[in-house]
């Protein structure tokens, strides 16, 4: 079949069929694990246009990509995002168009996104305490985010997932409450080990690190966790709750249980660099290809294919010590 002959296969025989695209580096939050408080954002001419983003998505889908996730920054602060979603969702062969959001704009955009063809949402929620939420996000309004979560449910989204970055001494005492919140709303929830991207001064990452094993052990004191073989085509490993049929608990463990052996994804930064690995700087400048050869999908396809030999077998994140990756998560696509 043509699809198989055109599929993207890396040097370790991993099929690449999942693309994460950052549509903006801007965000209305300043989460302490994601960016510096005085973050300087890119000039608009340095980021990909909506048309350029669509051209990359179109080419990846033609090459066998079955899942695309739009990220940021906060993707919903990018003007024209709903129209972009509609165009990407309509690409023949794409099975899932997902979007990761901080939830702040979902009150007004959940229904338009659903109508445009977005299939699933991931929503960040690191605390259920309004003051602590404000401390962790620096600018966020918890009530507004919860209203956005509820708007997503009302719009018709199913299998919506909450994402929580666990920081020891900051929000790790809320784990059970967060799971109960997810159960009440029939949501999935994933607990994430903090990733060492960008130099931050707000906290020491080694001291705040909380492993997925520790999180799971604490949850097991309150819930019956049943390991699941289900997959979302991403890095999360899921467990079912015997007490709640409509909620799964996931763990993303870049430090304690890295997911590199089955990695099926690449990332496009807002500047148009195709990152072959979250934890390495190997990349190819697709913006240059798009602008040097406008309207030439063959040149874009060649650049994508040629990039695959740069994809390493694994990352080498470390809990403590110097930061290995200087770019912040909002530049990479969270």
UniProtKB/Swiss-Prot annotation:
Pfam families: Fer4_12, Mob_synth_C, Radical_SAM
Binding locations of GTP: 20, 69, 100, 161, 265-267
Note accompanying the cofactor annotation: Binds 2 [4Fe-4S] clusters. Binds 1 [4Fe-4S] cluster coordinated with 3 cysteines and an exchangeable S-adenosyl-L-methionine and 1 [4Fe-4S] cluster coordinated with 3 cysteines and the GTP-derived substrate.
Domain of life: Bacteria
Enzyme Commission code: 4.1.99.22
Keyword flag Metal-binding: yes
Pathway the protein acts in: Cofactor biosynthesis; molybdopterin biosynthesis
Residue numbers binding [4Fe-4S] cluster 2: 260, 263, 277
Keyword Membrane among record annotations: no
GO biological process: Mo-molybdopterin cofactor biosynthetic process
Binding site for S-adenosyl-L-methionine: 33, 73, 124, 195
MF annotations from Gene Ontology: 4 iron, 4 sulfur cluster binding; cyclic pyranopterin monophosphate synthase activity; GTP 3',8'-cyclase activity; GTP binding; metal ion binding; S-adenosyl-L-methionine binding
Class of the enzyme per the UniProt entry, highest EC level: lyase
Cofactor(s) listed in the protein's UniProt record: [4Fe-4S] cluster
Keywords of this entry: 4Fe-4S, GTP-binding, Iron, Iron-sulfur, Lyase, Metal-binding, Molybdenum cofactor biosynthesis, Nucleotide-binding, S-adenosyl-L-methionine
Chain positions recorded as [4Fe-4S] cluster 1 binding sites: 27, 31, 34
Catalytic activity: GTP + AH2 + S-adenosyl-L-methionine = (8S)-3',8-cyclo-7,8-dihydroguanosine 5'-triphosphate + 5'-deoxyadenosine + L-methionine + A + H(+)
Residue span(s) of domain Radical SAM core: 11-236
Function: Catalyzes the cyclization of GTP to (8S)-3',8-cyclo-7,8-dihydroguanosine 5'-triphosphate.
Quaternary structure, from the entry: Monomer and homodimer.
HAMAP family associated with the record: MoaA_B
Family as reported in the entry's similarity comment: Belongs to the radical SAM superfamily. MoaA family.
Protein name (database record): GTP 3',8-cyclase
Organism annotation: Pseudomonas putida (strain ATCC 700007 / DSM 6899 / JCM 31910 / BCRC 17059 / LMG 24140 / F1)
Organismal lineage: Bacteria, Pseudomonadati, Pseudomonadota, Gammaproteobacteria, Pseudomonadales
Gene: moaA
